[in-house]
């Protein structure tokens, strides 16, 4: 009796993989990042004072890398700032915890954006 050759599992075709993340996704992620940064900026200054410009400075770097989205990014930053300002009028442990959560969320978004850049020639 002859042995049948083993069949290799078929690899999914390129078209069966998840669709490439397009410009709309990218723009949405940038806006979400700007909202997160705006919120984190407010929370940081309400707790540590106006001299702490860490998240505003980071936002400026994003805008410098993506100047075509300047208006959207500034609007998002300001919206995030106002949202957190309405929720956290004073600094307490909850305020500090929310800033840490926003920092983690912003990091996840930034990593996703970097992964997109790493997979393309867009820089």
Residue map of PLM features:
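Short N-proximal segments of mature Sec-exported proteins
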Residues: 17-72, 76-80
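Generic signal for short, ordered secondary-structure residues
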Residues: 15-16, 38, 85, 92
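Compact alpha-helical subdomains of small soluble proteins
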Residues: 52-123
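Compositionally biased, proline/threonine/alanine/serine-rich low-complexity intrinsically disordered stretches
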Residues: 1-25, 118-123
């Amino acid at each position: 009796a002859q042995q049948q050759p083993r069949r290799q599992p078929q690899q999914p075709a390129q078209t069966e993989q998840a669709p490439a993340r397009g410009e709309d996704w990218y723009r949405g992620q940038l806006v979400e990042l700007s909202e997160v940064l705006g919120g984190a900026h407010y929370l940081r200054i309400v707790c540590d004072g106006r001299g702490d410009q860490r998240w505003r400075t980071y936002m400026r770097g994003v805008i410098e890398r993506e100047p075509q989205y300047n208006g959207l990014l500034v609007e998002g930053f300001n919206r995030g700032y106002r949202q957190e300002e309405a929720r956290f009028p004073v600094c307490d442990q909850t305020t500090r915890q929310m800033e840490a959560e926003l920092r983690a969320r912003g990091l996840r978004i930034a990593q996703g954006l970097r992964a997109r850049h790493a997979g393309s020639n867009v820089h």
